[in-house]
């Protein structure tokens, strides 16, 4: 059985590697456009588009795709392109809760089944001083991270608590993915 990750995301691959899943990578390369405005529906729509694009190119396999966003005040936070944008985002996150939302789609070409779901994790941020924000911007590669922070990086010192799946913040809610694969009749060892 083949498991195909429809993503080139380094962190998603790391999560799958951690649990011992054997998979191949076939990124969808779609233009990520959705008319959905609700964060849950937005990520599910994009994950569906990615999985469907890859499924069209495959004869067999289980396609796994995901799309993630961070939002606060009902607004999606994008990757900062400049230090000024990163600083503005950190001010917005400071002392507040933000939400990591991941939409996941699994298309099982063996059984002709499709599952789409989303996971939400609350991320609590400490109140940051101006010095802490400046230090973070100088010492972290914020420019590569959606919303300017990575819980697996230096920003972990400013996140005292989360409510939900840690791996969801990394873009792959692996516990739920595993449960959904089980519902389809698969174990971790079924993929080669």
Regions found by a protein language model. Name each.
Residues 3-4, 25, 38-192:
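Anionic-ligand binding patches
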Residues 2-21:
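N-terminal beta1-alpha1 ligand-phosphate binding loop
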Residues 24-32:
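A short beta-strand-loop structural module common to alpha/beta enzyme folds
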Residues 10, 30, 111:
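Short, glycine/serine-rich, charged loops/turns that create anion-binding
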